Amino acid sequence: MKIVGADGQEQEETDIPFRLWRKFAARRKLQYQSWEEGKEVLLNKLDRNLLTDFKAFAARFSSRPRPSKIFGTSLSEAISGEGNGQSGRGAARNHPRARTRCGATSPNHGGRVVPVPVAAASPGAPKKADEAAYRVRGRGRLITRRAGAAHTQPAAIDLGGGFGHCAQEEKEAPFSQARAPAITRGNRGQRGRKRRCGATNGGFQQPTGANQAWQRR
């Protein structure tokens, strides 16, 4: 691009694209004329200080991230450097001090176990990365589940004072041990006879001890 003064004596050639000149001129509110699609620019007065400022403006723009239509970054934000060269949402999300908030948005979750935000502990207290706190909705107790354990070991803490104890740890038995032992085919008939009070003759109970002696009389 070639910048020429009104008198034609002063001129400056640069490799800066014309679109940056338009942004610079709009910010400075400069009046100019251009020919050949911006290859030549005519100013009323060509000032060396103005050219220096224009080169510095172009250098600042080229060093910052370019505007992205995907993230919605405006050209003014990219030029000024606001938001780290990103849109408002992206800058807030990728800010080094930004903290994500996890937890349920609805107060009622049908009794499901949902993660809730836990208050930050004091700097002196160590944080356990392998433990996550969950709250059971509608039951008023806090359950701590340890990730990586072979079996879930919930520690129930009474939040409403209804259990009468501070904490209780119980280990859930495997599903294979919790099932009742299988009944073989031969034991099924024996159990059936026991339910019928040991009947052997047509479902009637045999007389025992004193009843047999009384019948002999």
Curated annotation (Swiss-Prot):
One GO CC term, this protein: host cell nucleoplasm
Cellular location(s): Host nucleus, Host nucleoplasm; Host nucleus, Host nucleolus
This protein's UniProt keywords: Host nucleus, Late protein
Factors inducing expression: Expressed abundantly in the late phase of the viral replicative cycle.
Biased composition (Basic residues): 188-197
Region (Disordered): 79-113, 171-217
Protein family per UniProt: Belongs to the adenoviridae U exon protein family.
Record function comment: Might play a role in viral replication since it is associated with viral replication centers. Seems to have an effect on DBP localization.
Protein name as it appears in the record: U exon protein
Species this protein is from: Human adenovirus C serotype 5 (HAdV-5)
Lineage, uppermost ranks: Viruses, Varidnaviria, Bamfordvirae, Preplasmiviricota, Tectiliviricetes
